[in-house]
Amino acid sequence: MVEVTLLGSAQDGGVPQVGCDCCLDLEQRYPVSIGLTDAEGGKHLFEATRHLGDQLRIWGCNSVDSVFLTHAHIGHVDGLGLFGKETMAAKGVNLYCSKLMLELIERTPHWSTLLSDGVFIPRVATVYQFPGVIVEAIEVPHRNELSDMHAYLIKAEKTLLFLPDHDTWQETLRGHDLRAWLNHFEVDIALIDGTFYSADELKHRDQSKVPH
């Protein structure tokens, strides 16, 4: 049976977030991540956060077959190093990402060693097939200082959209309304960017500089 497990739902910094005094007493929440279990028990992790150990514990496993990355912003990738020799000492983990994301990994010394050491095997495509499930990458607009951004459609008996970050619905939908856009991709379940409740949420910062 194909299953998706929610492993985190917070923005890059998690909760409580460093530098924020309004959430110190809130229950801890991990940065956004999901785990996909395919029909033969293969484990596919979406995003590599700094809370990798806690999130694998939630998932009930201590290793994964593959990692999917949506983009290069810190909360989605700062757990990559935990797969290396200092921690997990993993080998042969498939790494699914865009061409631009892979190029960034290759020119970042701390990450490129994960490729040369055989920790990750990079796989660049737009459609990936596993037992009982297909994963399709969809490019969406989001601050591309370092790489592009891709959401993922996970297609099994039902279709789930994993869209943890984007800039604005106007740019993502490109003239379509939200319901029509979701219907076009035959989405049954949508996990979407909910970083900000309102445009006035950030104190002492210009929210237009960090669109979500």
Feature locations, PLM:
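Binuclear metal-dependent hydrolase catalytic cores
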Residues: 1-161, 167-173, 179-180, 189
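Cap/insert and terminal regions of metallo-dependent hydrolase folds
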Residues: 159, 167-212
